[in-house]
Swiss-Prot record:
Pfam families named among the record's database cross-references: ATP-synt_ab (PF00006), ATP-synt_ab_N (PF02874), ATP-synt_VA_C (PF22919)
CDD domains from the UniProt entry: ATP-synt_F1_beta_C, ATP-synt_F1_beta_N, F1-ATPase_beta_CD
Protein name: ATP synthase subunit beta
Sequence similarity: Belongs to the ATPase alpha/beta chains family.
Naturally occurring in which organism (per UniProt): Shewanella baltica (strain OS155 / ATCC BAA-1091)
Gene coding for it: atpD
Binding positions for ATP per the UniProt entry: 152-159
Function text: Produces ATP from ADP in the presence of a proton gradient across the membrane. The catalytic sites are hosted primarily by the beta subunits.
Chief place of localization: membrane
Membrane topology, as annotated: Peripheral membrane protein
UniProt entry keywords in alphabetical sequence: ATP synthesis, ATP-binding, Cell inner membrane, Cell membrane, CF(1), Hydrogen ion transport, Ion transport, Membrane, Nucleotide-binding, Translocase, Transport
GO cellular component: plasma membrane; proton-transporting ATP synthase complex
Gene Ontology MF term list: ATP binding; ATP hydrolysis activity; proton-transporting ATP synthase activity, rotational mechanism
Lineage: Bacteria, Pseudomonadati, Pseudomonadota, Gammaproteobacteria, Alteromonadales
Length: 463
């Protein structure tokens, strides 16, 4: 183990000088040795500047760092604990416990920088994963072992949707889950912990947090730490759920680090290596012949612009995209999923079956026609429409309302008990609306309910 000294500190960027014959490799973890708050601070090598000097990023607060401090090279990249000892625990980017429940007691540690599985090891699946959320199961069904993105601007419900998915899938799913909190609010991490504890599934979840208040190094690497833990479970032959909230903050941390390292920015100020960094992470989130990783990732959309380089780069890696819309949220329809913008590779008659495909297609066709007619209605009113178009509008408004659903995780705020709707009931309900079986029911009866049976019950009560 070679030792060096700190020669320059600029915020989270620390330059360390080593003897010429013992220069650390890129991604090696270095440790500060000294008095005060910086003792034990981990630095990750990013660049070799020549002359024995390496440029590193601090994986913690750099307060109190000064020139001349001794630095020891660990000789390997950052490692995190893996295996069953991590379940039920909250850890930071370095795999250190932050839940005040004693040491992790792991039997094994893995380095966080690993190569993605080779083509021959990977396996794809067409098995559907039922979420119990009508709009998702119908329009953008998830695949077991697939990658799903929840796209949305600020305050349209990404985290609430993710919490509901965790609630519905993690509880019903007998496998294990890993939750990586990347640059999100500490309060949400806290809420998640108690949500899991109250529902009795805490012993099946490993949590890794690098929240908003932490330096960019932590936020850039915490997704890799969480993924490494998930990979270990997958390689043991288990089916793992990986939740990442939020992928955009991972990109943002990369932008901060890139600027600190003095790289020339590219489009909209993002790092020039944006596509590569995203690829390194996303290519590792995959299923192999041994086990599967099903991942759900929240993606913040800056200024509601889906063409922004960060969400646009993420799109390419996903099997299903759930787009949350501010316009739909403003109508009071939650989950605010846009059925016309959301897509899934699984929505194919060979995978979901002809009936499901036809109903989903029918719903999208009716909603698209309603969208086109809105301008005519705004100028001329409903009376100028043909009878056929009037029927389309009435059915579209019912479909729009029927796409809303009370969530289990939002019971406290809404006062309505949460509803889980099976795929069979979802298809039956929307098929009935498209066929005109419920044309006689008022559209208010379709709002915030579970299955179509509840709509009929609600309509009968109002009579």
């Amino acid at each position: 183990m070679s030792t060096g000294t700190v020669v320059q500190v600029i915020g989270a960027v620390v330059d360390v000088e080593f003897p010429q014959d013992a220069v650390p490799q890129v991604y090696d973890a270095l440790k500060i040795v000294g008095e005060g708050p910086c003792n034990g601070l981990v630095l990750e090598v990013q660049q070799q500047l020549g002359g024995g000097v390496v440029r590193t990023i601090a994986m913690g607060s750099s307060d109190g760092l000064r020139r001349g401090l001794e630095v020891v090279n660990s000789g390997s990249p950052i490692t995190v604990p893996v295996g069953t000892a991590t379940l039920g625990r909250i850890m930071n980017v370095l795999g250190e416990p932050i839940d005040e429940a004693g040491p992790i007691g792991e039997e094994e540690r893995y380095v966080i920088h690993r190569t993605a599985p080779s083509y021959e090891d990977q396996s794809s699946s067409t098995e559907l994963l039922e979420t119990g959320i009508k709009v998702i199961d119908l329009v953008c069904p998830f695949a077991k072992g697939g990658k799903v993105g929840l796209f949305g601007g600020a305050g349209v419900g990404k985290t609430v949707n993710m919490m509901e998915l965790i609630n519905n899938i993690a509880k019903a799913h007998s496998g294990l889950s890993v939750f990586a909190g990347v640059g999100e609010r500490t309060r949400e991490g806290n809420d998640f912990y108690y949500e899991m504890k109250d529902s009795g599934v805490l012993d099946k979840v490993a949590m890794v947090y690098g929240q908003m208040n932490e330096p960019p190094g932590n936020r850039l690497r915490v997704a890799l730490s969480g993924l490494t833990m998930a990979e270990k479970f997958r390689d043991e032959g288990r089916d793992v759920l990986l939740f990442v909230d939020n992928i955009y903050r991972y990109t943002l941390a990369g932008t901060e680090v890139s600027a600190l390292l003095g790289r020339m920015p590219s489009a909209v100020g993002y790092q020039p290596t944006l596509a590569e960094e995203m690829g390194v992470l996303q290519e590792r989130i995959t299923s192999t012949k041994t086990g599967s990783i099903t991942s759900v990732q929240a993606v913040y959309v800056p200024a509601d612009d889906l063409t922004d380089p960060s969400p646009a780069t993420t799109f390419a890696h996903l099997d299903a995209t759930v787009v949350l819309s501010r316009q739909i949220a403003s109508l009071g329809i939650y989950p605010a999923v846009d059925p016309l913008d959301s897509t899934s590779r699984q929505l194919d008659p060979l995978v979901v079956g002809q009936e499901h495909y036809d109903v989903a297609n029918g719903v999208q066709t009716v909603l698209q026609r309603y969208k086109e007619l809105k301008d005519i209605i705004a100028i001329l009113g409903m009376d100028e429409l043909s009878d056929e178009d009037k029927t389309t509008v009435f059915r579209a408004r019912k479909i729009e309302r029927f796409l809303s659903q009370p969530f289990f995780v939002a019971e406290v705020f809404t006062g309505s008990p949460g509803k889980y709707v099976s795929l069979k009931d979802t298809i039956r309900g929307f098929k009935g609306i498209l066929n005109g079986e419920f044309d006689h029911l008022p559209e208010q009866a379709f709002y915030m309910v579970g299955s179509i049976d509840e709509v009929i019950e609600k309509a009968n009560k109002k009579k």
